[in-house]
């Protein structure tokens, strides 16, 4: 039987449940899918189906993640849920599951716990744009004042990490009771999803963002000029438009795209996802190299110093067997190339062990086109030993 057609008329967003262990993330995920399927049609998912998350490999890192899909009246969602805390850390840093927004689950019976804090910090550092809060297990709390106290604590915690704590929607309910079909709690799930629909911004499509293409290879074609090839990461470029060549040199240089070719056919323009060759006017083969990017002028700039949130692979994942210290000098692999950089650990951190995650300062020996949210791998001799995302650009 043919699968039903994917409905493109609804906007699509990627979200995930985050929060402390045993506060009810997976139960809530099951409750959302179940209640929405009951009210609006679609596939219900049981707790067990979600909890037995398959192992995935992303950049050589083993991550257990469950992906489910569901729809509200307004949107189509892909929802990611992870069984273990380490899986969240890896997922968010590698971008294995890009999140346009998150549902922070906090048990009303326990209040915010250490991983609640850590997941909020991670969300901020990896650039999750918005969070909505679900206060779970309210059926276990008799005291109305206690609920208000927990809500205040969560709001303060969000504000501490630069989320708008006063404005974030907080919905109180019970995922378990909703799964059991208790109507007042099913209504709370619908209320939560209304908040997610309204409060989590519609993600900007890659094709609407400013043009950027990482350069993978460079050819010179006799009589025509220099061609840079690569996959357009975002935006679009039209023949005749000006672009900048950015990275690995002190200053970006400007050129004009005089031709766009894909599968040996000439195009008027290329957009996100296309593998193309871009013919560049007045550029010699020496002026452009792998590791640079072509980009809309002024949209991205080259930098050497930044803060990053990093996950260090464990020995079992093929990572290092020993810790590293400040002044560690590995290669940082951005898009298509390795650049050596020097690591500076935060004050009070003596060393970083395999399997840890850490916020560190990095200084590259050559400038690379980066911005907040740019992802990279850390490598030693071609072997991946870490994965990271730029959280703050410093220079």
Swiss-Prot record:
Keywords: Cytoplasm, Elongation factor, GTP-binding, Hydrolase, Magnesium, Metal-binding, Nucleotide-binding, Protein biosynthesis. One of its GO terms (cellular component) is cytosol. Mg(2+) binds at residue 26. Residues 10-204 form the tr-type G domain. Residues 60-64 are annotated as: G2. Its main location: cytoplasm. Its EC number is 3.6.5.3. One of its GO terms (molecular function) is GTPase activity. Residues 81-84 are annotated as: G3. Residues 19-26 are annotated as: G1. Residues 174-176 are annotated as: G5. InterPro entries: EF-Tu_GTP-bd (IPR041709), EF-Tu_GTPase (IPR050055), EFTu-like_2 (IPR004161), EFTU_2 (IPR033720), G_TR_CS (IPR031157), P-loop_NTPase (IPR027417), Small_GTP-bd (IPR005225), T_Tr_GTP-bd_dom (IPR000795). Pfam families: GTP_EFTU, GTP_EFTU_D2, GTP_EFTU_D3. It is found in: Cytoplasm. Signal peptide: none annotated. Residues 136-139 are annotated as: G4. It catalyses: GTP + H2O = GDP + phosphate + H(+). GTP binds at residues 19-26, 81-85, 136-139. SUPFAM superfamilies: EF-Tu/eEF-1alpha/eIF2-gamma C-terminal domain, P-loop containing nucleoside triphosphate hydrolases, Translation proteins. Belongs to the TRAFAC class translation factor GTPase superfamily. Classic translation factor GTPase family. EF-Tu/EF-1A subfamily. GTP hydrolase that promotes the GTP-dependent binding of aminoacyl-tRNA to the A-site of ribosomes during protein biosynthesis. Monomer. This is Elongation factor Tu.
């Amino acid at each position: 039987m043919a699968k039903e057609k994917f409905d493109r008329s609804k906007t699509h967003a990627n979200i995930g449940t985050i929060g402390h262990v045993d506060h009810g993330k997976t139960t809530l995920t099951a409750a959302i899918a179940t209640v929405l399927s009951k009210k609006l049609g679609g596939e219900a998912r049981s707790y067990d189906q979600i909890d037995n998350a398959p192992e995935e490999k992303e950049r050589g890192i083993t991550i257990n993640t469950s992906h489910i899909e569901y729809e509200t009246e307004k949107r189509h969602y892909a929802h990611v849920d992870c069984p273990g805390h380490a899986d969240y850390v890896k997922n968010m840093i590698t971008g294995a599951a890009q999140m346009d927004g998150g549902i922070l689950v906090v048990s009303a019976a326990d209040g915010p716990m250490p991983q609640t804090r850590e997941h909020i910090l991670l969300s901020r550092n990896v650039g999750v744009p918005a969070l909505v809060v679900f206060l779970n297990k309210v059926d276990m709390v008799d005291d109305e004042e206690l609920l208000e106290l927990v809500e205040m604590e969560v709001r303060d915690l969000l504000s501490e990490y630069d989320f708008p704590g006063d404005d974030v929607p907080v919905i109180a309910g019970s995922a378990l009771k909703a799964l059991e079909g208790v109507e007042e709690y099913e209504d709370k799930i619908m209320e939560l999803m209304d908040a997610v629909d309204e409060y989590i911004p519609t993600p900007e499509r890659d094709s609407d963002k400013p043009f950027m293409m990482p350069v993978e290879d460079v050819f010179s074609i006799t009589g025509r000029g220099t061609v840079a090839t690569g996959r357009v990461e975002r935006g679009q470029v039209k023949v005749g438009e000006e672009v900048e060549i950015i990275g690995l040199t002190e200053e970006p240089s400007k050129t004009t795209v005089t031709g766009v070719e894909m599968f040996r056919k000439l195009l008027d323009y290329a957009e996100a996802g296309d593998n193309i060759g871009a013919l560049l006017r007045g550029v010699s083969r020496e002026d452009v190299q792998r590791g640079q990017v072509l980009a809309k002028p002024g949209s991205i700039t080259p930098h050497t110093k930044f803060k990053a949130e990093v996950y260090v692979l464990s020995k079992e994942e093929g990572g290092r067997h020993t810790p590293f210290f400040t002044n560690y000098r590995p290669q940082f692999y951005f898009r298509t190339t390795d650049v050596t950089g020097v690591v500076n650990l935060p004050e009070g951190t003596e060393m970083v062990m395999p399997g840890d995650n850490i916020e560190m300062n990095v200084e590259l020996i050559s400038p690379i086109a980066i911005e907040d949210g740019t992802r990279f791998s850390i490598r030693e001799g071609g072997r991946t030993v870490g994965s990271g995302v730029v959280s703050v650009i410093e220079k």
